[in-house]
Curated annotation (Swiss-Prot):
Gene3D superfamilies per UniProt: 1.10.720.60, HAD superfamily/HAD-like
Family: Belongs to the HAD-like hydrolase superfamily. MasA/MtnC family.
Name used for this protein in its record: Enolase-phosphatase E1
Quaternary structure and partners: Monomer.
Species for this entry: Shewanella woodyi (strain ATCC 51908 / MS32)
Designated gene of the protein: mtnC
């Protein structure tokens, strides 16, 4: 059964992890106080603030306290949906102002079009919001890559470390599990995808990266179908 769709992880696979941590995370942490003050009456932002209070079990937390909680979550790389939603909104602002572009590994930029020419669908799956993924790929070093994508999945689909998230993706794209290839640098994610029946490849971009018993590639140019 041939591959009909590829699901790619972002950080460490299509995107340098250092760009995520040093540029995007740092930018969002610094921008949070002013962004929340200026946008707290926005319905989406207000919902996120309420969700932060609920998750932190601090229903009466002030806006300043919510900022503290969010900045702590950024430090911990917490996979909390309200944080990821707010980060996406803040990054949208940063991209629009031209304060940074989205780093994408050149081998992915060079390969994505040839993958599509083989009638293979491409999806991304990240703990970052779908909106943040679209921003990353639309403002990339290689220009707007979003026309090559068929969809983006985030934490609303499920936790990347658990089988159910990948089952949900399979159901959404309406393919047999073995027709879907998941590519990630993270062993635990690959295990979960494998449990769901997907084919897997581990992206290994550095010599000191933790590896497992998965087929490995160091570049998207190594893909063969």
């Amino acid at each position: 059964m041939g591959i009909r769709a590829i699901v790619v992880d972002t950080a460490g696979t299509t995107t340098d992890l250092n760009f995520i941590k040093d540029t995007l995370f740092t930018y969002s942490a610094k921008a949070l106080p002013d962004f929340l003050k200026e946008n707290e009456t926005n319905v989406l932002v207000d919902n996120c603030i309420c969700d932060v209070r609920d998750i932190a079990l601090e229903p009466d937390a002030s806006l300043e306290r919510v900022v503290e909680i969010l900045q702590q979550w950024v430090e911990e790389d917490r996979k909390a949906t309200p944080l990821k939603t707010l980060q996406g909104l803040i990054w949208k602002q940063g991209y629009a102002r031209g304060e940074f572009t989205g780093h994408i590994f050149p081998d992915f930029i060079d390969t994505i079009e040839s993958i599509k020419q083989q009638n293979i669908r491409i999806y991304s799956f990240s703990s970052g919001s779908a909106e943040a993924q679209k921003l990353l790929f639309s403002h990339s070093d290689g220009g707007d890559l979003t026309p090559h994508f068929d969809g983006h999945f985030d934490t609303r689909t499920g936790n990347k470390l658990f089988k159910q998230a990948y089952c949900n993706i399979i159901n959404t794209i309406s393919l047999a599990p073995k027709q879907v290839l998941f590519i990630s640098d993270v062993i635990e994610e690959l295990k979960a995808a494998e449990e769901a029946g997907m084919r897997t490849l581990q992206m290994v971009r550095s010599a000191d990266q933790r590896t497992g018993n998965f087929k490995q590639i160091a570049s998207f140019k190594e893909l063969t179908f």
